[in-house]
A protein has these predicted regions:
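Interfacial segments of multi-pass membrane proteins
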Residues: 26-38, 76-82, 133
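Juxtamembrane boundary at the C-terminal end of a transmembrane helix
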Residues: 133-142
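Short, conserved beta-strand edge motifs with alternating hydrophobic and charged residues
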Residues: 28, 42-46, 68-69
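Hydrophobic, membrane-facing alpha-helical anchors
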Residues: 1-4, 39-49
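Short, aromatic-rich membrane-interface segments at the entry and exit
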Residues: 20, 36-43, 85-89
Length: 142
């Protein structure tokens, strides 16, 4: 496996079946054990590396199922807002829900072509999950 495919597949995680996107999300869950700023930094790194890798793949017009660095970026962003184990579980569940159902802006981004669309729908899904978690924290759910 070349370096670009290794990055895009998150070290081969994207080739796990079934549900490679879920495996990509699960792969970054250990970030929940670290301070939130680490997950936020990871989200930025995954986003940048993912965009870079996607511009170098021949399949840049599509969103191949084995490309899961986008899930890593979005899930990391959601985890940055998680507090406690309930928050971590909600971060995972909300991110996967928004990534799969593609509501509103997630669906808009998903319809964009190329590396931007591949990365943006997951980053937006992660931001939406983080926003829900922050709102829940404001009302005392942690």
């Amino acid at each position: 496996m070349d370096a670009v495919r290794a990055i895009a597949s998150l070290g081969g995680v994207g080739f796990l079946r079934p549900a490679p996107g879920t495996w990509g999300s699960l792969a970054v869950m250990p970030l929940a054990l670290l301070p939130p700023w680490v997950a936020l930094l990871a989200a930025f790194l995954f986003t940048g590396l993912g965009y870079w890798a996607l511009t170098r793949l021949p399949e840049t017009g599509a969103d191949p199922g084995w490309v899961v660095i986008d899930e890593a970026a979005g899930q990391s962003l959601a985890l940055a807002a998680a507090t406690g184990w309930l928050g971590v579980l909600l971060a995972f569940a909300l991110f996967r829900l928004f990534d799969i159902t593609k509501p509103g802006p997630v669906g808009w981004a998903d319809r964009r072509q190329g590396p931007f669309g591949v990365m943006a729908d997951d980053v937006i899904a992660g931001a939406m999950a983080a926003a829900v978690l922050l709102l829940l924290a404001l009302v005392g759910v942690r």
